């Protein structure tokens, strides 16, 4: 079962909400930016990495965190097994 989780990257707290409880496929990601809770989506690609699906919906300072957020998703699910 795929689980929701929180993690910190670069001192910033990210909340991951799964969009599929059986298959590791996509997440809604929430982050506080300038006192506003922002949502963007990450989805798995053919190589098994998670990418931000709409880079315009993710605050620019966090775009560089994409590989770390992908790694956090993969590691969180290994821990849940």
Where are these regions (language model features)?
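Negatively charged, low-complexity tracts enriched in Asp/Glu with abundant Ser/Thr
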Residues: 1-22
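Exposed beta-strand and adjacent loop surfaces of beta-rich binding modules
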Residues: 2-4, 26, 39
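Intrinsic-disorder/low-complexity loop/linker signature
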Residues: 9-11, 35, 48
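A short, sequence-level motif marking secondary-structure junctions
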Residues: 18-24, 43-48
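Short, surface-exposed, low-complexity cationic segments
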Residues: 22-34
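Acidic, low-complexity intrinsically disordered segments
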Residues: 37-81
């Amino acid at each position: 079962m795929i689980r929701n989780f929180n993690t910190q990257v670069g001192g910033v707290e990210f909340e991951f909400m799964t969009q599929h409880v059986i298959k590791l496929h996509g997440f809604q990601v929430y982050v506080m930016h300038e006192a506003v809770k922002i949502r963007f989506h990450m989805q798995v690609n053919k190589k098994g990495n998670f990418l931000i699906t709409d880079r315009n919906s993710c605050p620019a300072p966090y775009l560089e965190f994409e590989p770390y957020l992908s790694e956090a998703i993969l590691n969180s699910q290994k821990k849940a097994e």
